[in-house]
Structures are given as C-alpha cells and as structure tokens.
Amino acid sequence: MKLGVCTWTFGPISLENTFERVSRLGFDGVELHGDLESFTPEYVLGLCQKHNLQVFSLTPGDCDPASPDASDREAADKYYRDLIDFAHAIGGARVSLHGLVGRIRPSAGSDHATEYGYLVEFLRPICAYAAERQVPLVFEVLNRYESHLINTGEQCRQLIKDVGSDQLKVLLDAYHMNIEEADPVKALAQTGQQLGLYHVADSNRGGIGQGHSALQPQFEQLAKMGYPGPIIIEAPAMGPDPFTPVKEGDYLTKLEHQLSLSVTALREQFAPATAI
C-alpha cells in the first residue's frame, strides 16, 4: 500500500523542503496543494525524481463551484480546468474537488437544492474535460462544519449518479467520517469500487493513534474490498485551529512526530504476509 501526505500540512516552507521531509519520513508520495502560481509541472516532476516521490493527487485551493454567483462558478471552472491540465502534465494525478471550505449554509437568497443543482451542472463539463485529458477526479466528502453540500458517502454516490460520469469517484476521509457517518466501515463497504481515494486522520485530526477513532476496522475494510491505494495522511500539527498548519512552537517537529507514528502504523497494517 502506497502512502502519501498532504503538502499543505507542512505550512509555508518551500516545496523542496517539504519533499525532502516527506521522503525522509518514508512516504511514497504527496497530495499536492493546487497553488498553481507557485510552481510549474516541470519543477514538480524534478522534485519527484530527485526525492523518489510521486504526486498521487492534487487538492484544490479556494473556489466555489456551487455559488449562486455565476462569476464564482466561472472562476471555479477555469481553476479546475487549469488544475486538470497540471495533473495531465505531471502524469495524470487525481484531482480532488469539493465545495468551498467554510461555507456551511446556502448563500443568502439561495437554498440547498438550488446550489446542489449548480454543483451538478458544474461537474458535468469538468468531468468531460478530465476524461479528454485522462485525469481521474474524486469528490471529497467534507463534514458539516466545513461544507453544507456533500457530507456523507451516500450523498456523494448520489451526486456521481446525478452527474452521470464514470470519471468521478468518491474521496472518503476518516476524520470527516468520524463526524458524519454512523458506521464508517459500512460507508466504505457501500462505496466499494467507487472509492477513488482515502484520507486518514484521527478523531482530533492528529496522526493515527492520537485520537479515539476506530481506524483499524477501516483499514481492514480497505484490504477486504481490494482498495489499491494510496492512503493519504491529512493531519496537521496538533494544536488550535485544525485548518492552519503553523502552530505555536516547533510545529514541524510536532508534525513529523505524528507522521512518523502514522507511517509506522500503516506499514505494519499493510505489510505483505510472510510465507511460512
């Protein structure tokens, strides 16, 4: 099982420094934050070669594909097309989509059904474009404290059905499932082959074993259903505000400690069986 980590959790250090740390910690690759103004595909490919890493996926910056404001949706359309082009240029990494983080209710004068309709209409041409560029898409299921649109695996599977494209799959995250799913293992099982990516963090958004989430049954379910990977750890340094990577003190040492524990736990969990 290949393991990755979200680059945004390393904060404002350079991408090269981030890749150095990721490689040293024993990861196979990264989920790259989609800040397209900060680096080129050629630069990223060079870092991958230098540090023997892959870019498994791209996570989007701030945009609102379900906004009642057409100009917001147009900006999101351009951004995601650029992100898909970037993913194509580096070899076809998955592109993650989700609603605008922090918008936890419909905009004034709007409602959930209307904005859901905007999202479906937005995704159809984006999926078609991604298919042309041979770039897989995953829609990340966020908890209700981050987004009002898609909060459960069931809702995401319905979204994919309404969009009508096999190019789009589900991204389930253990941290969000701990909040929204009555049974995360069941959510994984019901998603089945529609699972395109899996994120993990414990209940407190720390590393594996730092909270109270029952992660072991989820890992067993992933193995049972033949999920090929990767597993992406999205666990910033512990402290106030889980959306901000930089915490008081030496946040990078704190971050690397919990990532190291998580890598060890996952390597042990998914180690190949030894023949007797």
Protein language model annotation of sequence segments:
Residues 37-47:
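Active-site-adjacent beta->alpha loops and helix N-cap segments on the catalytic face
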Residues 9-11, 34-36, 60-64, 99-103, ...:
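Active-site-proximal loop/turn and secondary-structure-junction residues that shape catalytic pockets
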Residues 1-2, 9-23, 38, 91-93, ...:
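Histidine-acidic metal/acid-base catalytic patches
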Residues 64-74, 113, 204-209:
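The substrate-binding groove and active-site-proximal loops of carbohydrate-active enzymes
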Residues 21-37, 59-62:
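N-terminal substrate-binding region of glycoside hydrolase catalytic domains
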Residues 31, 57, 96, 138, ...:
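Conserved beta-strand positions in the central sheet of alpha/beta enzyme cores
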Residues 49-50, 70-169, 252-261, 276:
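Active-site acidic/histidine proton-transfer and metal-coordination neighborhood
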Residues 28-29, 54, 93, 136, ...:
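Residue-level detector of anion-binding/catalytic polar loops
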